[in-house]
């Protein structure tokens, strides 16, 4: 593949001589037949020393390399380039005789079903979808077209997944929500009889669990991307194009709007509303609803400017405490002297 081929595939302008490209790498590690990219200005000094055959850059830096692909969004276009070089997922094709497919299940054309997959009654698998070994698709489930379910993904009964979704290993959709009642007879389970729906173009990271609703539907909106080890409680609604980073926990019946970003280890209490375009910093604890467009951080979470001022003050607290104690003692001494004088 030549640089001109990549430029044509991505619709980018080529500056400089055309070259052969055999792979993709970082600026530092790239060899003379690899393409790289510059998205972060702090790596500009690496342009002078890179051995890369070509670099995807914004127009302002194109003059610093011999061969450049000029991009308005170098990181995004680098991702598109990776698709051109990505290795095929597995060598198997077709439907394995060692998969169990219920007679009432429907399998679309061009699907790949690996050995040891289970597909239950009335389940539907859309065209071009791949299920790797160990996947479980329960009865009445529906998986859309061109989806990729990595090994050991579990879809419990009546779960629905849209088109172009990627579910990484260990994902569980539709397990019972954490519903229990304390009674005089002990802790009693509340049956969870709802389901989970995942929209189109959703990616869910390894070992993430999204619980079925008590009644109704737990919903993940179109275009949302979730990292590994995320927990979504029953009856949660997550909007479109959200980014949910690792170890986030969202408690039951909370509504998350569109384009929300939650950094790692955010905890969200139940029955809240998180507005559109909210950003929440890492390790934050959300205990109340948040208006659209806010940036929050801390435990409990407050608006970013308040949180940053708090972080600035916290290292000074031990010294401030010592000074306060000293002032208190001096004040007590002055009171004592004043009492003796009277």
Curated annotation (Swiss-Prot):
Its EC number is 2.3.1.191. One of its GO terms (cellular component) is membrane. It comes from the Bacteria. GO terms for molecular function: N-acyltransferase activity. GO terms for biological process: lipid A biosynthetic process. Pfam families: Hexapep (PF00132), LpxD (PF04613). The active site is at 234 (proton acceptor). Pathway: Bacterial outer membrane biogenesis; LPS lipid A biosynthesis. It is an enzyme of class 2 (transferase). SUPFAM superfamilies: Trimeric LpxA-like enzymes (SSF51161). Keywords: Acyltransferase, Lipid A biosynthesis, Lipid biosynthesis, Lipid metabolism, Repeat, Transferase. It catalyses: a UDP-3-O-[(3R)-3-hydroxyacyl]-alpha-D-glucosamine + a (3R)-hydroxyacyl-[ACP] = a UDP-2-N,3-O-bis[(3R)-3-hydroxyacyl]-alpha-D-glucosamine + holo-[ACP] + H(+). Signal peptide: none annotated. InterPro entries: Hexapep, LpxD, Trimer_LpxA-like_sf, UDP_GlcNAc_AcTrfase_non-rep. Homotrimer. Catalyzes the N-acylation of UDP-3-O-acylglucosamine using 3-hydroxyacyl-ACP as the acyl donor. Is involved in the biosynthesis of lipid A, a phosphorylated glycolipid that anchors the lipopolysaccharide to the outer membrane of the cell. Belongs to the transferase hexapeptide repeat family. LpxD subfamily. HAMAP family: LpxD (MF_00523). This is UDP-3-O-acylglucosamine N-acyltransferase. The gene is lpxD.
């Amino acid at each position: 593949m030549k640089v001109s081929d990549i430029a044509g595939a991505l619709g980018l302008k080529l500056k400089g001589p055309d070259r052969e490209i055999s792979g993709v790498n970082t600026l530092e590690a790239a060899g003379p037949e690899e393409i790289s990219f510059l998205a972060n200005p702090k790596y500009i000094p690496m342009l002078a020393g890179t051995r890369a055959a070509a670099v995807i850059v914004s127009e302002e830096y194109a003059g610093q390399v011999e061969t450049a692909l000029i991009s308005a969004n170098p990181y995004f276009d680098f991702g598109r380039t990776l698709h051109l070089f990505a290795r095929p997922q597995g060598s198997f094709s077709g439907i394995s005789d060692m998969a169990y497919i219920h007679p009432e299940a429907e399998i679309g054309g061009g699907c790949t079903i690996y050995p040891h997959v289970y597909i239950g009654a009335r389940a539907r698998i859309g065209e071009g979808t791949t299920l790797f070994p160990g996947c479980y698709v329960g009865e009445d489930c529906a998986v859309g077209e061109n989806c990729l379910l990595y090994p050991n993904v579990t879809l419990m009964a009546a779960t629905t997944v849209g088109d172009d979704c990627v579910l990484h290993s260990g994902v569980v959709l539709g397990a019972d929500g954490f519903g229990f009642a304390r009674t005089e007879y002990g802790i009693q389970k509340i049956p969870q009889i709802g389901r989970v729906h995942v929209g189109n173009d959703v990616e869910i990271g390894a070992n993430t669990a999204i619980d079925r609703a008590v009644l109704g539907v737990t919903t993940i909106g179109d275009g949302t991307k979730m990292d590994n080890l995320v927990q979504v409680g029953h009856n949660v609604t997550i909007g479109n194009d959200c980014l949910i980073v690792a170890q986030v926990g969202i408690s039951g019946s909370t509504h998350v709007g569109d384009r929300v970003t939650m950094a790692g280890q955010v905890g969200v209490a139940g029955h809240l509303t998180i507005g559109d375009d909210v950003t929440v910093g890492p390790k934050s604890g959300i205990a109340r609803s948040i208006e659209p467009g806010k940036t929050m951080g801390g435990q409990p979470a407050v608006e970013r400017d308040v949180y940053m001022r708090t972080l600035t003050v916290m290292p000074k607290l031990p010294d401030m405490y010592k000074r306060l104690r000293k002032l208190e003692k001096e004040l007590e001494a002055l009171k004592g002297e004043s009492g003796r004088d009277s």
